[in-house]
Each structure stands twice: as C-alpha cells, then as structure tokens.
Swiss-Prot record:
Main subcellular location: plastid
Key word Amino-acid biosynthesis present: no
An example Gene Ontology CC term for this record: chloroplast
Gene, per the UniProt record: matK
Purpose of the protein: Usually encoded in the trnK tRNA gene intron. Probably assists in splicing its own and other chloroplast group II introns.
Keyword Protease carried by entry: no
GO biological process entries: mRNA processing; RNA splicing; tRNA processing
Subcellular location: Plastid, Chloroplast
PANTHER family, per database record: MATURASE K (PTHR34811:SF1)
The protein's name in its UniProt record: Maturase K
Annotated InterPro entries: Domain_X (IPR024937), Maturase_MatK (IPR002866), Maturase_MatK_N (IPR024942)
Keywords, comma-separated and alphabetical: Chloroplast, mRNA processing, Plastid, RNA-binding, tRNA processing
Family: Belongs to the intron maturase 2 family. MatK subfamily.
Length: 502
C-alpha cells in the first residue's frame, strides 16, 4: 500500500514555473539555476551539452530577441505584396519560445533518470529500427496480439490539461490556452489519419511535445497497472482512485463498476507492449478471452482517465499462429517450425516430432501497391501508369529516381525470408520506367530500348539485391564455431511512404 502511495503521489518538487522565463526572454537562462525544478538534478554536470551552457544560451536568446523584434516590426508594417498578411507570425514565435522553455527541465529530468543506468548495447543489430530483435525474442513465445491505434485527443485542451499536473503556476497554462484558442488554424493542428496523426508543419516541435507528453503520461500509468496486475486480487481498489482524481472526478461506485470485473483476471506476466508511429501492439501468451479483457480495459482506461473515446473496433485481436499483424511495414507472425529428432535407447530407436515457434516476416504486397497507387505509379489494381509530370526530367534522372525507389524497398525488406512479392513491385517499376521514357520521347517501347540499350535497363532495374549477412562468434559455444544470423540493411536514412503503411 505504501509503495502505491509513493508512486501515485505527484511529486511537487518536479513542478515548474514557466511564465516568468517566457515573458522575460533575456533571463531564460535563469531557468537552469532554478533549484526548485528538481533538487536531485545537478545542473552543472560536466556531461551536459556544452552548446546549452548558460552564457551561450543567454547570448543566443538576446540575439534572437533583437532579430525577432525587427522581424515583428516588419511584419506589422504594410501588407507584403508577395506573402500578404502573416496572421500567425506572433503565435508561431510564442509556440517556439514555449517549446524551448518546457523542454529544458524535462531534458534535465531525463539526464537525471539515466544516471547510474547502463545502456545495453546490442552487438547483433538485425533491423533498420532495432526493434526486430526484441520482437523476435519476446513475440515468439506469445500466442495472441492486439493491434491498437493510439488514441488521440479530440481537442487541444486535453493535451494542455495533462501539463497542469507538472506546471504549478496557472498563468502559464492560461497563456498557453489563450494562444491555442487564438491560433488561426487551431482546428487543423492535429489531423487524424488512418493510423497516425499529422501535425501542422508550423509549430510542429511544440505540438509534438504536447502529444508525446500526453502519450507518455498515460503509458506510464498503464505500465504501472500492468506490472501490478498479478497482485490485483489482494489489493484494495481504492488505491487506484487516488491517481484518477488527478485527472477527473470519478465516484468510487463508477470506478468499481467499470474496472473491478476486468482487473482481477489480469494475471498474465508475459504481456509485451510496444508503440511505433501511433500504433500499439500488445502481445501475450494468454487466451483470446484475456486479450478481449485487456481490449475493453484499454477503452475504459482512455475514456475515464483522459476523456478520450477509443473505438473498440479499432483494436484488432489476432492469433499469431494463424494471422499476421502489420508493424514497421512488415506483416509479422509466429509460425510453427516442425522438426524431427531420432533418439536411440539401447536396442530401440524413436522418432520424436517437435514444433518450435519462429518469428516470421512477410512483404505486404497490398499496402505497397496502395502506396504506389497513391503516388500515381500505378492504379489500385497494380497496373503501371506513366509519370507524365517527369517529362521535364532527363532520362538519367528518371532512371535514377525509379531505381532508388526500388533499391530502398529491396533493402528495407531484405530481412524477410519470403521476398516473392518484390518481383511484382519490380515488374511495376520496370514497366513504369519504360512507359515514362516512351511517353516523354513520343515513341514506342522498342525505340526507347534500342536508343538506351536493353542491357542498361536490364542490369539497372533487374539486378537482384543480395541478402546481407554478418558472421558472429558465439561465446557460449564450447567448440568456438561460427554461426550466421540474418540482419536487415542498415544504410538507409529515409524510407518513403511505400515502406510506412501506418
């Protein structure tokens, strides 16, 4: 009970004052000297980024304030004949300044939490995002997975309300709320899409901070409840009511009615949770009944804690042995790999059948064709289309663009054992290339091939991508043999929307 109270109690020493540094921008550097932010943080840490030192920060803000004053004077003058009136210029300046202010203490808090913790370094990286090793090791023992789209706040007020438990001066929140309501495009700050959320390009840094802080806040509570799920039978439910009061006034009877019948069955110690680009995956080795209870618990959790309505139909539960879930651009599943072992006992021999689980990844052809269709490379059925907008480009630029697209897709999906679907993508891009060049030169496909040379196109667009391997030495092996592990191609800094289907 005391452990819960210590966790659920809001630490007042971590609340921050933001209004004064925001108004007096010249003295924002004093924020780092405010010992009330978090007494456990040593602000003069030598490991702290030198670029954020007090003197440099003060000079930077002073110079920015002078430049901002000149820009504001120019913006407040007559109408710009090229751009017109800049109605949200002041709001953009305020949002950027507020983002800088609020990020400083949370960054310092992050440094404090990392002190004394050793960061585990993986010497066997197997994916572009370094997530497949955890998925292969943890999801291989799971039986069911629930794919849920992260709930988004319907209004910016919900995002601001989450900050009020960390900001102790109401003036900052009122000022922030005022600028949000006065913002010209406040209705398009967060636009819900199919599985993710797109932020306005302007002030993106600040709204990303609000959204990420909101998500991390409910995830921290969710992880805490999940870690204590195996003990819920012997714990009074009133202890969780204390944390709810920080977010919404809820009567005890309502809380018991909504949650008591759900929480007591959560005794699964093998529940895994991962989130990426607005999509969350919960994997468990429990039954479908258990996952259904987690599903409706999440719906009630978001609704009662954060006043967010999450549609239950957007949470899909699949058996990993029979279905695949879309994550990181792959269709992932857990397949049974049968094996036969022969044993000899004195005069008799036996054949023992054994089936082991293996994490398998497939290339999703349907979402890839949908992305190519969205980019006007083909139609919804996968039939190639000519890119008439590329007629102004040179032949080498057209070949380079299409070749780079295919190379990125081939490299990204090189970690999959079954890459037959890439042959269809290769065919679409090959016909697209030839058709675009023929349309540009107003000729036939044969004339284009004769002019450029069949060998160039065949060598460039049909070259088979090699699967990359690394050889590691297994330390635990007594014979010191070498073994091979498949890895994903890592030399990609940007993957187009064709690989990100969320």
């Amino acid at each position: 009970m005391e452990e819960f109270k210590r966790y659920l109690e809001l630490d007042r020493s971590q609340q921050h004052d933001f209004i004064y540094p925001l108004i007096f921008q010249e003295y924002i550097y004093a924020l780092a000297h405010d010992r009330g932010l978090n007494r456990s943080i040593v602000f003069e840490n030598r490991d702290y980024d030198n670029k954020s030192s007090l003197l440099i920060r003060k000079r930077l803000i002073t110079x920015x304030x002078x430049x901002x004053x000149x820009x504001x004077x120019x913006x407040x003058x007559x109408k710009n004949k090229f751009l017109g009136y800049n109605t949200n210029f002041d709001s953009q300046m305020i949002f950027e300044g507020f983002a800088v202010v609020v990020e400083i203490p949370f960054y310092l808090q992050l440094l404090s939490s990392l002190e004394g913790k050793e960061i585990v370094k993986s010497h066997n990286l197997r994916s572009l995002h370094s997530i497949f090793p955890x998925x292969x090791x943890x999801x291989x023992x799971x039986x069911x997975x629930x794919x849920x789209x992260x709930x988004x706040x319907x209004x910016m007020e919900i995002l601001v309300r989450t900050l009020r438990y960390w900001v102790k001066d109401p003036s900052s929140l009122h000022l922030l709320r005022f600028f949000l309501h006065e913002y010209p495009n406040r209705n398009s700050l967060i636009t819900p899409k199919k599985y993710s959320f797109s932020f306005s390009k302007r002030n993106q840094k600040f709204f990303l901070f609000l959204y990420n802080f909101h998500v991390c806040e409910y995830e921290s509570i969710f992880v805490f409840l999940r870690n204590q799920s195996s003990h819920l039978c012997s714990i009074s439910f009133e202890t969780f009511l204390e944390r709810i009061l920080f977010y919404k006034k809820i009567e005890l009877e309502v809380f018991v009615k909504d949650f008591k019948g759900i929480l007591w069955v959560f005794k699964d110690p093998f529940l895994h949770y991962v989130r990426y680009r607005g999509k969350s995956i919960l994997a468990s080795n429990g039954s479908s009944l258990l996952m259904n209870k987690w599903k409706y618990y999440l719906v009630n959790f978001w609704e009662c804690y954060f006043s967010i309505w999450a549609q239950p139909r957007r949470i899909h539960i699949n058996q990993l042995s029979n279905n695949s879930f879309d994550f990181l651009g792959y269709l992932s599943s857990v397949r049974l790999k049968p094996s036969m072992v022969r044993t000899q006992m004195i005069e008799n021999s036996f054949l023992i059948e054994n089936a082991s689980k293996k994490f398998d990844t497939l290339v999703p052809i349907t979402p890839m064709i949908a992305s190519l269709s969205k980019a006007k490379f083909c139609n919804v059925l996968g039939h190639p289309m000519n890119k008439x907008v590329w007629d102004g480009l040179s032949d080498s630029d057209i070949i380079e663009r299409i070749g780079r697209l295919y190379x990125n897709l081939s490299h990204y999906y090189s970690g999959s054992l079954k890459k037959m679907n890439l042959x269809r993508i290769k065919f679409i891009l090959r016909i697209l290339l030839c058709g675009t060049l023929a349309s540009k030169h107003k000729g036939t496909l044969r004339s284009v091939l004769n002019r450029l040379g069949v060998g160039l196109l065949v060598e460039f667009i049909t070259e088979e991508e090699q699967v990359f391997y690394l050889t590691f030495q297994k330390a635990s092996s007594t014979s010191r043999k070498l073994y091979q592990r498949r890895i994903w191609y890592l030399d990609i800094f940007c993957v187009n929307d064709t690989a990100n289907h969320e």
